[in-house]
Amino acid sequence: MKSRLDQFRATRNALLGLMMCASPAWAQTPAPAPLELRLADVGRFAVFVDMGAVQRTGSVVKLRVLQVAEGGFTAGAEAFWGGWRHEVIDCQARTIAHAGFASIRAGGREGPLTGDQRPAAPLSAGSADDAVAKVVCDAWRPYAKVPVATSVEAAVKIGRPLIETGAEP
């Protein structure tokens, strides 16, 4: 027996199929691009520049820097790998403005970005900030034998032993 609504069945099925294909539940998000974390300095922290996040506008560079803390670093009762520092560097004026920090707990969970952009200040010669500026402004490549890390976890595995030994470029 035929229903009066049979004439709409094909259209309904086509619309349902289209809605399912366009649904966010069915959409596949592309895998995030691997990081390119280049070691810039080793001191109290191992400092890596995220080369994929470098944004240039004239002589001004916006970037983020991964600070890897020494093994066993805790704040309160939680273990931390380190954190992301967000920076604005003026390569011509040789100044840096800190623009926030996001912690990274052991295991890789990132905290929110906190802090506002501070006024620009001159780079201190020989500091970690100076090393970062040399990497992004002058194409300096210290630690040439140290591999570029493609994840935060890899940077932690590379950086922590270097902090212990006090590696030099």
Residue ranges and their predicted role:
Residues 1, 19-20, 51:
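Detector for methionine-enriched segments
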